[in-house]
Amino acid sequence: MKKIILGWILLQACFYGAIAQNKINSNFANSWTDSVYNSLSEDERIAQLMVVRLSSIDSKTKLITFFDDKVAGLVKQYNIGGICLFQGGPVKQALILNKLQAAAKTPILICIDGENGVGMRMTDSVLPLPRQMMLGAVQDTNIIYQYGKIAGEQCKRMGIQVNYAPVVDVNNNPNNPVINDRSFGEDKYKVAQFGIQYMKGLQDVGVMACAKHFPGHGDVAVDSHLDLPVINKSMAQLDSLELYPFREIFKAGIGSVMVAHLYIPAIDSAAHRATSISKNNVTGLLRNQLGYQGLTFTDALEMQGVKKYFPGGEASVQSIIAGNDMLCLPEDVPAAISKIKDAIKDERLSWADIELHCKKVLAAKYQYGLSQLQPINTENLANDLNSKVNDMRKQVAENALTVLKKSDDIFFPMIAPEKPVTDEVVYVSIGTSSDNAFAKRMRNDYGAAVFYFNYKQDAARILSTVELIKKRYKKVVIGIHNYNRAPANNFGISKAAIDLVTQLQQQANSVTFVFGNPYAIKNWCTAKNLIACYEDDAIIQNIAIDLLQGKIAAKGKLPVTVCEEYKFGSGITTSVFSAHGGNRPCGHRQ
């Protein structure tokens, strides 16, 4: 009995001790926030709400331009609140950030648009993690959590406090030009579940996650970077689909949300009123109806979806009127600050509004460690950022590759012979002109002949090659490579390439691997044996060969519908081939 009483006393002590500690921490946070706020000028209080870009890349020349001198000027003159990292090497960016943070009166909130890790941006020396569509084919949610942790650890190593991820848009439009393979797929439950796991991975290592793009960017036909997309859905329709993942991830405790540039008349019918600058959307729907009180970021204000209709700093004014906390990438910071001050004079805004948003930003800075900021250590930086990427890519590939059709257990899996046999196997590589990892394995493991075709191949060569293959080779392996991620113009896949693959896959012993956006599979749904690989690199290609040989089991399921034959959730589960047992692995659909 004494032990029970003692245990109860200790439990109560721990409980009330935790409450007391939380109160102390809260008091420190409030004290720091108030102290910093009181030290700021009016211009600085407004500038704390702004996130500016550090670099950009020319889409044609691929040349990277850094704006560190310009940003340093904004830090010095206005005490800018945030910086968003884009292209450029990690060491260079880290050195610039160290310099800027040292010069800043108030620690700067560092953000990145790193949906698949910092390698999404720092492409010169950091490998990207798989995109979310490939993750959507995985069935083990712990992998998504571990993925989020790796992305978070990368951010921490780079001195980044906020990652603009995960994307929780439900991609229910296969022709979506801007979200597409950035989404976990078309199923709202999976999008919500995987989004929460990604969020937990980030936030468990001390990086703020950001759900985007509220209220849902998955069913658009226009890229909001170029114009304002229109979604003509009722509130009931939005509530049943698009809003579901946001509601769930809000309840799970996500630190921030990014608001999209969308025109949704059911939310706000004012002409050209994007959801990012709509009070009905941000204050009405997001804050009041859904009850979300975390930090809100606008999508980039340099995008044409809002800039086209609200130029010259007016988009910044409208963003704050709508109820946003942080303004991403206003093109002209001085003009935006001036416009916001004019709006206060005109009583469209108030200094109380600025105080509310500024203190929320400062509180987030305290929460994510900026009150005790340390410089980024650049020693071994790129190696540290890459240290877990390949293992995660391999783990995702082993769990995501999806066998959509398996018509012959005798042919597939295709066990590699002890000694490769000539004129037995041919590999036809579409979209390449030289050996990749898949082609090398086909040569080494099977003694396969390899034919290359680009997407501009003439019909005459295709016809002659098809005839040659039919006469000479018993087994045909086809790989579709290097097509575009975006669905415009059928992913850049030519009719000639479609016809070539269609003819080749009529062979009884043929198998087709599609290395890229799964929506492109619509072109080859009649394949005898068909595998979705989602992305295209050496790791994934080697895993695909292992799957072909029965060395690994197929576990993946389609995250989207690609044609009538293969809908969301399609995928055949296989077992590993046992050479000793002599049994061929049988596949079964789920």
What are these regions (language model features)?
Residues M1-K23:
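Bacterial Sec-dependent N-terminal signal peptides
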Residues A20-G73, K279, N288, F310-Q590:
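Preference for extracellular/luminal or secreted protein segments
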Residues S41, I83, K92-I108, V118-M120, ...:
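Second-shell residues forming the walls of enzyme active-site clefts
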Residues A47, R53, V71-P90, P174-N175, ...:
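Short acidic, glycine-rich surface-loop motifs adjacent to enzyme active sites
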Residues V52-F66, M133-Y145, D227-L241, Q304-F310:
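Active-site mouth loops of central-metabolism enzymes
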Residues S55-D58, I112-M120, Q161-N171, A211-H217, ...:
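Short glycine-enriched loops at secondary-structure junctions
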Residues P90-P107, Q139-R157, I354, K359, ...:
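Active-site-adjacent structural elements in enzyme catalytic domains
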Residues A137-I160, V167-S183, K188, G195, ...:
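A substrate-binding/cap region within the structured catalytic cores of diverse enzymes
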